[in-house]
């Protein structure tokens, strides 16, 4: 075990000491024009942010903050350590956003170095950056499996755990102190990682810092799996891949090496199952195996011990579920997925004798979760808790074209995202709710009734709510109208979707604290 720890420390040896001079010295111009970042053609995870968060702006803000502190010292006897105050929220927010940019530099440099010389491979696999590419992976690899481990990755509720994980990769005492300061100032520890419920300025106004900390924590969690798999060369997997996308990276790893450690101290056993798949997006991961309930229970025990002893997080029983793929649904990326056995009857005749043969065809089914979607529409004030459409009073002062365009965009995005559903009936119901809500919003604005309003505009009003997706497919296949209609009734995965829809993301990064 000590030998593995030594190798792990060597793998983490690429540490940087430039955060302190970057913040408080004049070397900022050198790093701001670093050739390694500028020459990269790989789209990094959090690229394209506002120039207000640039490192040069942060340096100027720090200088202005120190000037204000010195002036306050000469003006009156005040405490210069009161950095975050009611009047200084703008300065603290700007510095924290700039700090997020700065701490991403070493990880971006490592990513550029790792992907150097692989631009052609990344260009070929550009479509795999889409989160919809996960579902064809499910269809190709999960249809012959039986058991699924549904895992909700916990998040540490103590700030020192985050600082300790970050300390493995960045060797700079000043930046660690600054990170600890931001964590203690901004986090509401009673509702950690619940930005939609927390009143914290950090969680609502600095999502970049939040995503960086979350991804670094998950990266630390997953690095143990990949490190032990690479070290066990005699059990090396046949194929593996790591794919990056713009929100958070996920991995599709085949033939994982199973690692079971007893209290992470004494003994280490390595064994491998020939059919094992792992997929993760944000805080939820799926581990699938074929007809091995004992193996899945060992994985569950291993994960609980990993969280408890390495991350000091007490795992609740509801975070890990062992489900049968053909009996239970997998709630992943806004879809309910499971395996399904379809019986196909084949008539075979030999001379004068005829036989009926039942063939069980295994398929992977994806459906729309109608109840969570109605809950999201209820929170957005498009319908009530029973799914009955209501008007949108906040848009009553807008023009008719604006109201119709807003409803059409929402309906188009939901149809686009749920185009891979096996059953379109639930999607039709969502479209109906949005259509009637749009009509009621217009009726409320014009102080009329639904019957009079539709009679004046005609029965063909807002038919695009139901024909928009079919129209898009007809543009893709202009010479085959029948093909486009058949695809519309079937499942279509769009590989240009790189993030989950707000109405689909029912959790929205929410992880209940332990």
Swiss-Prot record:
Keywords from the UniProt entry: Chloroplast, mRNA processing, Plastid, RNA-binding, tRNA processing
Main location, first listed in the record: plastid
Pfam family, one: Intron_maturas2
Biological processes annotated in GO: mRNA processing; RNA splicing; tRNA processing
One CC-aspect GO term: chloroplast
Compartment list: Plastid, Chloroplast
InterPro entries documented for this protein: Domain_X (IPR024937), Maturase_MatK (IPR002866), Maturase_MatK_N (IPR024942)
GO MF assignments: RNA binding
Similarity remark: Belongs to the intron maturase 2 family. MatK subfamily.
PANTHER family: MATURASE K
UniProt function note: Usually encoded in the trnK tRNA gene intron. Probably assists in splicing its own and other chloroplast group II introns.
Name of this protein: Maturase K
């Amino acid at each position: 075990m000590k030998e593995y720890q030594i190798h792990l420390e060597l793998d983490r040896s690429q540490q940087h000491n430039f955060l302190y001079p970057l913040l408080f010295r004049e070397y900022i111009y050198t790093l701001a024009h670093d050739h390694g970042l500028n020459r990269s053609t790989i789209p990094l995870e959090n690229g394209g942010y506002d120039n207000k968060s640039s490192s040069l702006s942060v340096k100027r803000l720090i200088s202005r903050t120190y000037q204000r502190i010195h002036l306050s010292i000469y003006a009156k006897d005040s405490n210069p350590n009161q950095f975050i105050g009611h009047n200084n929220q703008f300065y603290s927010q700007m510095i924290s956003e700039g700090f997020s940019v700065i701490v991403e530099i070493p990880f971006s440099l490592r990513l550029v170095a790792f992907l150097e010389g692989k631009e052609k491979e990344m260009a070929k696999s550009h479509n795999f950056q889409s989160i919809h590419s996960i579902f064809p992976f499910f269809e190709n690899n999960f249809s012959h499996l039986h058991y699924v481990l549904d895992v909700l990755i916990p998040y540490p509720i103590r700030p020192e755990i985050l600082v300790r994980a970050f300390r493995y990769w960045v060797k700079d005492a000043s930046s660690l102190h600054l990170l600890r300061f931001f964590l203690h100032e901004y986090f509401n520890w009673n509702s950690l990682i619940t930005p939609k419920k927390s009143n914290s300025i950090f969680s609502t106004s600095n999502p970049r810092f939040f995503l960086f900390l979350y991804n670094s924590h998950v990266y630390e969690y997953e690095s143990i799996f990949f490190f032990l798999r690479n070290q066990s060369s005699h059990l090396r997997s046949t194929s593996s891949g790591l794919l990056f996308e713009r929100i958070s990276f996920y991995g599709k790893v085949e033939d994982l090496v199973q690692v079971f450690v007893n209290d992470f101290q004494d003994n280490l056993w390595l064994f491998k199952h020939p059919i094992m798949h792992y997929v993760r997006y944000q805080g939820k991961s799926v581990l699938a195996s074929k007809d091995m309930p004992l193996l899945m229970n060992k994985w569950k025990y291993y994960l609980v011990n990993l969280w408890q002893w390495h991350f000091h997080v007490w795992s609740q029983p509801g975070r890990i579920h062992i489900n049968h793929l053909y009996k239970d649904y997998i709630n992943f990326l806004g879809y309910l997925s499971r395996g399904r056995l379809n019986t196909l009857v084949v008539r075979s005749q030999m001379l004068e004798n005829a036989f009926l043969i039942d063939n069980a065809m295994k398929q992977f089914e994806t459906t729309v979760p109608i109840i969570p979607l109605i809950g999201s529409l209820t929170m957005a004030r498009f319908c009530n808790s029973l799914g009955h459409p209501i008007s949108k009073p906040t848009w009553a002062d807008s023009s008719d074209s604006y109201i119709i365009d807003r409803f059409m965009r929402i309906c188009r995005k939901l149809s686009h995202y749920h185009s891979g559903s096996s059953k379109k009936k639930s999607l039709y119901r969502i479209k109906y709710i949005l259509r009637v809500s749009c009509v009621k919003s217009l009726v409320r604005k014009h102080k009329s009734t639904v019957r009079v309003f539709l009679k004046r505009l005609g029965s063909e009003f807002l038919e695009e709510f139901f024909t928009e997706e079919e129209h898009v497919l007809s543009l893709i296949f202009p010479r085959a109208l029948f093909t486009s209609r058949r695809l519309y009734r079937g499942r279509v995965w769009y590989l240009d979707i790189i993030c989950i829809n707000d109405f689909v993301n029912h959790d929205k990064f929410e992880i209940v604290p332990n």
